[in-house]
Curated annotation (Swiss-Prot):
It comes from the Eukaryota. Disulfide bonds: none annotated. One of its GO terms (molecular function) is protein dimerization activity. One of its GO terms (biological process) is positive regulation of transcription by RNA polymerase II. Probable transcription factor involved in seed development. Plays a role in seed morphogenesis by promoting the correct development of endotesta cell layer, which directs the further development of the seed coat, the endosperm, and consequently the embryo. The gene is AGL11. This is Agamous-like MADS-box protein AGL11. It is found in: Nucleus. Residues 87-177 form the K-box domain. Keywords: Developmental protein, DNA-binding, Nucleus, Transcription, Transcription regulation. Residues 1-61 form the MADS-box domain. Signal peptide: none annotated. GO terms for cellular component: nucleus. Its main location: nucleus.
Length: 223
């Protein structure tokens, strides 16, 4: 049969308690020594008996080991402080971002003409100046686009007029050939239809969807 499990509790008998202390103390010191040798660990052990007597073991200078422990403990505490500082920093940055978002939202509402009751006369004047500058930029861009569109339509007008001149020349040539009985009536009518279709394209562009007047053009008539 194996040994029964010993209940861990305070030994009431003083003699037995002292004997047990000596045995366990020696075993503990032996284990500390073995740990330092086998594992190349820095070990320091301090034991105070119930009578106040001190027993110690260290494979290094015990004071040096204690100082090393204090430093390690201090670094650990500072690490916790660093984490707290970082947490506070991110909380402050988050609050700043929320404030900036709120300011931008208020600014957008003001630009839309909303929530103006809280603004002073000076702030309203500043808002008015911002809107006027914005309108000026918008009008400038609009004018730029209109000029580009008019320029394109003018170029297209010239192209169509050149086509019209070319077709007038062709129709005159066909008429001469018809008079000489070299072109049939069917072919002549087909050419006339083609000329008419191309001739009316400039007029369609004049009344296009832009809604902006074009410069006066010289209209060429066929025939």
């Amino acid at each position: 049969m194996g040994r029964g499990k010993i209940e861990i509790k305070r030994i009431e008998n003083t003699t037995n308690r002292q004997v047990t202390f000596c045995k366990r103390r020696n075993g503990l010191l032996k284990k500390a020594y073995e740990l330092s040798v086998l594992c190349d660990a820095e070990v320091a052990l301090i034991v105070f008996s119930s009578r106040g007597r001190v027993y110690e073991y260290s494979n290094n200078n015990i004071k040096s080991t204690i100082d090393r422990y204090k430093k390690a403990s201090s670094d650990s505490t500072n690490g916790g402080s660093t984490m707290e500082i970082n947490a506070q920093y991110y909380q402050q940055e988050s609050a700043k971002l929320r404030q900036q978002i709120q300011m931008l939202q208020n600014s957008n509402r003001h630009l839309m003409g909303d929530s103006l009751a809280s603004l002073t006369v000076k702030e309203l004047k500043q808002l008015e100046n911002r809107l006027e500058r914005g309108i000026t930029r918008i009008r400038s861009k609009k004018h730029e686009l209109l000029l580009a569109e008019i320029e394109y339509l003018q170029k297209r007008e010239i192209e169509l007029e050149n086509e019209s001149v070319y077709l007038r020349t062709k129709i005159a040539e066909v008429e001469r050939l018809q008079q000489a009985n070299m072109v049939s009536t069917h072919e002549f009518n087909a050419i006339q239809a083609l000329v008419s279709r191309n001739f009316f394209q400039p007029n369609m562009i004049e009344g296009g969807s832009t809604g902006y007047p074009l410069p006066d053009k010289k209209v060429l008539h066929l025939g």
